[in-house]
Amino acid sequence: MDGSGPFSCPICLEPLREPVTLPCGHNFCLACLGALWPHRSAGGTGGSGGPARCPLCQEPFPDGLQLRKNHTLSELLQLRQGSVPGPMSAPASGSTRGATPEPSAPSAPPPAPEPSAPCAPEQWPAGEEPVRCDACPEGAALPAALSCLSCLASFCSAHLAPHERSPALRGHRLVPPLRRLEESLCPRHLRPLERYCRVERVCLCEACATQDHRGHELVPLEQERALQEVEQSKVLSAAEDRMDELGAGIAQSRRTVALIKSAAVAERERVSQMFAEATATLQSFQNEVMGFIEEGEATMLGRSQGDLRRQEEQRSRLSKARHNLGQVPEADSVSFLQELLALRLALEEGCGPGPGPPRELSFTKSSQVVKAVRDTLISACASQWEQLRGLGSNEDGLQKLGSEDVESQDPDSTSLLESEAPRDYFLKFAYIVDLDSDTADKFLQLFGTKGVKRVLCPINYPESPTRFTHCEQVLGEGALDRGTYYWEVEIIEGWVSVGVMAEGFSPQEPYDRGRLGRNAHSCCLQWNGRGFSVWFCGLEAPLPHAFSPTVGVCLEYADHALAFYAVRDGKLSLLRRLKASRPRRSGALASPTDPFQSRLDSHFSGLFNHRLKPAFFLESVDAHLQIGPLKKSCITVLKRR
């Protein structure tokens, strides 16, 4: 009767509508059962007033059994109708006899292991809601003991009895209770996931196995799980190690973010203060210039206006005397002589020439002075802006940033960096170094991202523009700037050099100029089998220290310094700290008689004009080193911070 598929009603032979799951596990339409059971009670099997029975297996059920909709099966039916065309979307007709039966019909189940007997209700953790039986009355459902992937329902121990007694139900696959049964079904075919493809590493149903994965290595899920459980501890350990590394990286990134934010806030405050001072200086200069103009204007204007008044008064007197002379009668000789004398006296008062215009106005030079200041300011701003962006030379540009500020902020830190100090102090600046395989020379064999060894046979690495071609060297990933960084290296065997190299240094340089410390773009600490020495710009400075298998490197970018330490028993002993000496007030350098220090004084600061990378040179044929040991101890410190 159920030849049309497990998602069809055995009564109407159409796709299930409001599916109901009986305690025996069979599914029917709610309307079909409602129409069938009154008829069977009246005259069907069991006789009038007899118990209702399953139309398929004739399992009797007590009177008053409440029929409840199977919501999980209903959701699966909606998913199947919306995504996969098939028999469910086609209307039932009389020709269904010739249709291909659904492969996953309960009447022809795929081979499966022997079903286990119904078990006691699952013991659920405290506070977690157990999966309820789908066949129990609503509101009184017991915890499910098993879930049936064929019936798409979960059953308690009592309602699992039909799966034990009925031969048609014994082939159903029973699994521990599942809260979402659809997750154990193929989303494409809505069949139980029973196989595992090792080629594509996915779980499959039988239909997927026969259609899309022919020729692949397929195994039962239980077999693959048993195999994977053996590898589980290794995977968990690797995940834990990776999480520890990420934790260290996160701590370091957080320190970097905090450093950037605090540095930006402090720099903004300093810049704002300096701009305010510069603005105040310009405002004061403007007031002085404007006052000078006003003072010059008042002085010269007062003198010119006084001359103007005197000339106007003299002209007025001459005009009056001339007029009076013209009014004298011809017969009045006395008046004539008096008025003529008055006119002559008026002429004698201002017989000299009047003051001419000034040859030069002194305050008119103010604009020239201000223009010179403006041009100088514009030029200085443009030049310093180029220096700030890194477009100009460092010698005539910006001053070294923050050297005095760093020392004044934490005087104890400098003393720790220049003497013996506990290792925990440096772990605050721990930097996780990963070797960059794209830079490794062909005679270097990498072990993950932490180990490297020189070999005799070349390794066929892929071509890379950053790969060293003439020197057995390798760089670390990432470029360093604007901070303090610390990492450690274990010298396992051979001649090894450890240091830093400028990011833009060409890896195709010849052997004599491309080696670490043999140019102005790198510096290093070398162990040559007999003792330690430091190299920079082609000069070597031997160090009187015994061999230490673990070497610490501390890059102080803000202070333009690089320090090397011997790590023993949780303490660090300074081997050498490379830094340019400060010039004395007379202009002489601190150590003019030391050629190596003189070379540092003249060229070492230029190394910090670039971003720097950790660098490693394996000089002898048996050289071998390992990055570390910044492991659990370092991670613990970083996590505490």
Swiss-Prot record:
A zinc finger (RING-type) spans 9-58. The modification Phosphothreonine is found at T72. GO terms for molecular function: ubiquitin-protein transferase activity; zinc ion binding. Expressed in hepatocytes, expression is increased in fatty livers. A zinc finger (B box-type) spans 181-221. The keyword S-adenosyl-L-methionine does not apply. This is E3 ubiquitin-protein ligase TRIM47. It comes from Mus musculus. The lineage of its organism: Eukaryota, Metazoa, Chordata, Craniata, Vertebrata.
